[in-house]
């Protein structure tokens, strides 16, 4: 993506009316959840600071009575943190209910919550940098700074639609402009960017602008998940839009994972991003299945259509099994909500049972395959892994044999659906999602009714063993990069000049204004290029040489008019219009860099969907090693703690003799 700069003439500091956040977080359900998440984040931050101060006091004092009091207070703080973490996990683990103005009931999806951030004051560092490096009055850029701050404030509460995505990408593109104009390998803005982890609520802060860009990119992916989960997937078009949104979300997480290392928060670690990418691809695959199987138009007698649906369902089940294995392994197991892992497991069992159900429908209600169709139909099945018999035809043609095999597949479908209901009942958060239970129960009732129809009292034949279903899909979803160009807008600080010259990476000296009079051979200089116009050559002994102009200077003002954005023809026309009085020019001369950047200072910059993120640790600006900036104290609140519970609340520490500070933390905390 090429950054678009606007020439002079556009009003500085004008805020586009479409780039505005939600007026109130409480207008919609998602806004209410986001508002509550923000409150919990602030409470967690406060409790962490209290715990840090108490631990420092414990280490500093040698009075046993004071230590006992501090240890007791720490136990209360740890209990409060545990409760806050569990509440945040419930909010983060909430799933989409699956009904959006439609009579049909669909399986719920998993949307991600947005990362929260604190307000940021851009004014002081930007004004100082504009004054020191660019040689201009920083106060004259207050309108631009206010526009940037308003844009950042608005992107904290984006609407859950395309306008919200446009708002986030607009701010992301402005960060790219800021990176290109104001940052160098040896200089950062000196601001601390403070963001809360989306999964754990742990606060993290860094001075690197890359952390801000990475967090915004994460929110772009998270907003795509919310848009996808809100679609009405009971119709083909809604399923297509949902699949598109989940693919865009997977692309955002993939881009972040490939180009952002040493993440300060768990949700942006490589392991978490990989798990989120797999989850989004599995949900996109589920949308493919839903787009193929509108219940009203399905003909049970269409054997080939039923077998294709069976393979599509088996493909969805395989995707969710992969996601479940990833979520069950550390460190992802310690980050993601328990309800996510449970829902993924339920879906894996549900879609595997659905595959067997569709095969049973094909065998029992469909017509036998012809000799030419038989090889294609048999590719649906996999032989049982424990079978030692030689492989024979797996798709019988006789009516009774088809009934027996269909009955075996129905049995596996019923067992799988009952297992899905059992797993659903084990998770308290999922139990609150009645629609999920309704979907599984409805499918189970259909399977039981069909099984009762096939069952006979005089059927004493040995039950056949139903083979596994070969996963296959006609459309494999792929991660797609988010449309970072849809929010592309002009550079807010365009008045400073074109980025090719007027950036913190270059040093220059302002010359002039100098007065030029026309001689016999003109002004004695040759111009080239646009925005800004370059003095390509100066004739020795000419008027330009006498005025001190040099080859390589850039013209920034003609007769008092700023011309940094003028084209070559405009500058030439203005100079030709000068009469005997001549013209007044102001130029800048580029200076050699005082120090060439070393190899370690050369870091890529993410300017678009195919670029790279600048390293988040700016040279010479280290993030303070504060205890609340580390994600580790909160990552294992409930997992290990609940394993060691014997009932009731955590027991307060009552040390008889001074214990090391690490023993004051909740069991299972690092």
Swiss-Prot record:
One of its GO terms (biological process) is signal transduction. The modification Phosphoserine is found at residue 24. Disulfide bonds: none annotated. Binds specifically to GTP-Rho. Interacts with ROPN1. The gene is RHPN1. The lineage of its organism: Eukaryota, Metazoa, Chordata, Craniata, Vertebrata. The PDZ domain mediates interaction with ROPN1. This is Rhophilin-1. Pfam families: BRO1, HR1, PDZ.
């Amino acid at each position: 993506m090429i950054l678009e700069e606007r020439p002079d003439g556009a009003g500085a500091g004008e805020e586009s009316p479409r780039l505005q956040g939600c007026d109130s977080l409480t207008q919609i359900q998602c806004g209410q959840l986001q508002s509550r998440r923000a409150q919990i984040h602030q409470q967690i931050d406060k409790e962490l600071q209290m715990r840090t101060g108490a631990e420092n006091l414990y280490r500093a004092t040698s009075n046993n009575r004071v230590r006992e009091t501090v240890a007791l207070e720490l136990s209360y703080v740890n209990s409060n943190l545990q409760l806050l973490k569990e509440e945040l996990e419930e909010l983060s683990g909430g799933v989409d209910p699956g009904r959006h103005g439609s009579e049909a009931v669909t399986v719920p999806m998993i949307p991600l919550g947005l990362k929260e951030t604190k307000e940021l004051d851009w004014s002081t560092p930007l004004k100082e940098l504009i004054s020191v490096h660019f040689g201009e009055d920083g106060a004259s850029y207050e309108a631009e700074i206010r526009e940037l701050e308003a844009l950042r404030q608005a992107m904290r509460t984006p609407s859950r639609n395309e306008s919200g995505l446009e708002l986030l990408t607009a701010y992301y593109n402005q960060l790219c402009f800021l990176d290109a104009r104001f940052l160098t390998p040896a200089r950062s803005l000196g601001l601390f960017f403070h963001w809360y982890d989306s999964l754990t609520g742990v606060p993290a802060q860094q001075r690197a602008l890359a952390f801000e860009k990475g967090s915004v990119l994460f929110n772009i992916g998270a907003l795509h998940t919310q848009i996808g989960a809100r679609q009405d997937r009971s119709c083909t078009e809604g399923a297509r839009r949902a699949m598109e949104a989940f693919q865009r979300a997977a692309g955002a997480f993939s881009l972040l994972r490939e180009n952002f290392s040493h993440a300060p928060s768990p949700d942006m670690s490589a392991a978490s991003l990989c798990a989120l990418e797999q989850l989004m691809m599995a949900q996109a695959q589920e949308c493919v299945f839903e787009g193929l199987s509108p219940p009203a138009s399905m003909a049970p007698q269409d054997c080939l259509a039923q077998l294709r649906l069976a393979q599509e369902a088996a493909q969805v089940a395989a995707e969710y099994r992969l996601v479940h294995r990833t979520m069950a392994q550390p460190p992802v197991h310690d980050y993601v909500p328990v309800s996510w892992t449970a829902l993924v497991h339920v879906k894996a069992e549900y879609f595997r049972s659905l595959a067997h159900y569709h095969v049973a429908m094909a065998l029992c209600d469909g017509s036998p395959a012809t000799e030419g169709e038989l090889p294609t139909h048999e590719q649906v099945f996999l032989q049982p892994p424990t079978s030692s018999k030689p492989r024979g035809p797996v798709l019988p043609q006789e009516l009774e044999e088809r009934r027996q095999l269909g009955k075996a597949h129905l049995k596996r479908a019923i067992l799988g659906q009952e297992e899905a209901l059992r797993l659903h009942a084990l998770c308290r958060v999922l139990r609150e999602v009645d629609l999920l239970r309704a979907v599984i129960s409805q499918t189970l009732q259909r399977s039981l009714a069909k099984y009762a129809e096939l069952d006979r009292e005089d059927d004493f034949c040995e039950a056949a063993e139903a083979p596994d279903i070969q996963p296959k899909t006609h459309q494999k979803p792929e991660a797609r990069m988010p449309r970072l160009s849809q929010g592309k807008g002009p550079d807010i600080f365009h008045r400073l000049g074109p980025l090719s010259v007027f950036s913190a990476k270059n040093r220059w000296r302002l010359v002039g204004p100098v007065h030029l009079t026309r001689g016999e051979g003109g002004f004695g200089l040759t111009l080239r290029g646009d925005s800004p116009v370059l003095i390509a050559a100066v004739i020795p002994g000419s008027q330009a040489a006498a005025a001190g102009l040099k080859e390589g200077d850039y013209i920034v003002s003609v007769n008092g008019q700023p011309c940094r954005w003028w084209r070559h023809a405009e500058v030439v026309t203005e100079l030709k219009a000068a009469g005997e009085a001549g013209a007044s020019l102001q130029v800048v001369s580029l200076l050699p860099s005082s120090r060439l950047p070393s190899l370690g200072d050369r870091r890529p910059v993410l300017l678009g969907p195919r670029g790279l993120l600048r390293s988040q640790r700016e040279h010479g600006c280290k993030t303070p090693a504060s205890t609340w900036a580390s994600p580790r104290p909160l990552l294992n609140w409930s997992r290990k703690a609940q394993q060691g519970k014997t009932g009731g609340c955590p027991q307060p520490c009552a040390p008889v003799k001074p214990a090391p500070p690490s023993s004051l933390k909740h069991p299972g905390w690092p």
